[in-house]
């Protein structure tokens, strides 16, 4: 399911919930007209059985914000019970579009719409916002709570992320370089997939796939998103970390926006900001 919003759309200064969308954040003053290349965003989510209401609300607020900044956006949802296949099909749809950037958003993630502008403005090949896993380290939570004064329920989150140098994390304007990170809120430029297609021609998928109740061949269908198992080490890598590895192996770089609040919804709403977790960030 796909629908587009172009820069000619008209919106009110208030969003659909009647709240003023101007939060005073500097990124809201970003003049996209000064960019050399026109941004066209492809917002996509692999789904299975439904989406979280908080995800829907954040998506609608993002739509309003992008319209104000005259950034065209295509929204694309695909139903797949296999997350790797879902991500590959989303990527295929992006490559068939004329969009310049693809934004992966998992359907259990709630985000601040301004963080998307922050990632676009960073102008990186790949930039993501890390979100907490659905688990709490209570020993860590206790220590951070005692040191920071924050409530224990807001501490002790675990963020699945690997740094280039864990002992020397350099952060500028909330953006820092990483080795691996989650794909549930990840912005990727088109040129990333174009380069990966050149470097990994063996990943081309040629078989037919069920789409819209029909078996058909899919254009630009690549197995960029797949899990990885190291037989020698006996270690498993999820499709997002494995994707990051593919990109860095051919010289690419990955960045994270660590200064944005994001919520991972489940039985409990895990809301956090990586920079608050007592990490060494300078």
List each model region and its residues.
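Conserved catalytic core of nucleotide-sugar-dependent glycosyltransferases
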Residues: 91, 112-226
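N-proximal low-complexity "stem/linker" segments adjacent to membrane-targeting elements
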Residues: 2-80, 85
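Short beta-strand-to-loop acidic/aromatic patch adjacent to the donor-nucleotide binding site
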Residues: 99-110
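Active-site nucleotide-sugar/metal-binding loop of Leloir-type enzymes
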Residues: 88-101
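Active-site acidic short loop of glycosyltransferases
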Residues: 38, 97-100, 124
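Short, Asp-centered acidic motifs that coordinate Mg2+ and/or phosphate
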Residues: 101, 126, 254
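C-terminal catalytic/acceptor-binding lobe
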Residues: 3-20, 24, 28-29, 36-39, ...
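Residue-level recognition of beta-strand->loop/alpha-helix junctions
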Residues: 77-79, 130, 258
